[in-house]
């Protein structure tokens, strides 16, 4: 227990360091003493520095923190519920559903959505469409979960929904303008920089609500690790638990995808890294460790995006596979061995 507590402490320290580096590093060099002062409310005479730290770097660091924790927790819950090491937030087509809605807005509706007297355009339209579509796919999966008792069948249904969405997106890309296709591809690369300071309270509240709900389900998750029959013998309502897990996962995935785009590999790889770190399947330790590790990995990926010296920014989905893919290959080879 002491060793695990030490690992958690080191992980928290690692997150704090990465969070600080995310506030320091960028295309514009802001000295550490001024960054520290700006964060605590002592703004400098340089308005550009104030704007960069408060309006740009702080929201981006908070977004990475929340997004990493949300996707990692979602991945762990799905892997446990379906006893599948390759289950992740995108496996049920939730990401694909959000991507389809964004494709419709960007490629078919010209970047705007009109509902009676309400007209949404630009980022607001994309945010609205992706969130609504992701939640719609979640409710479809939830409806199937009440009828389909077999986990494998439910996974296949989710994969098929993803294929259907991808097919429609391909058709939309074929008939779209070059500018529309370019805009959609940029959104699909993912970014932690799309959440403004004004949207941060809503984004963080939604993510924290989902994470708190996931922590409440620690005991049922522990029971599910030993199989559905064993869980039922302990008095766990497996169907109800699976429904709740899908609802929480859908909420977390919908929020993160709507604001950040379809971020790959974090939800798939981080739970495995957390298992290696903690050496346990007890979700009382594993779930908090997964959330913290997800926060750290997302902050690290966000930091790596700013490595180019010429001021350009690497897309987040160009970084996450470099970390996630080797982990998945290692896990699969270890299981095979």
List the predicted regions and their residue ranges.
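Alpha-helical transmembrane segments in inner-membrane proteins
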Residues: 1-337
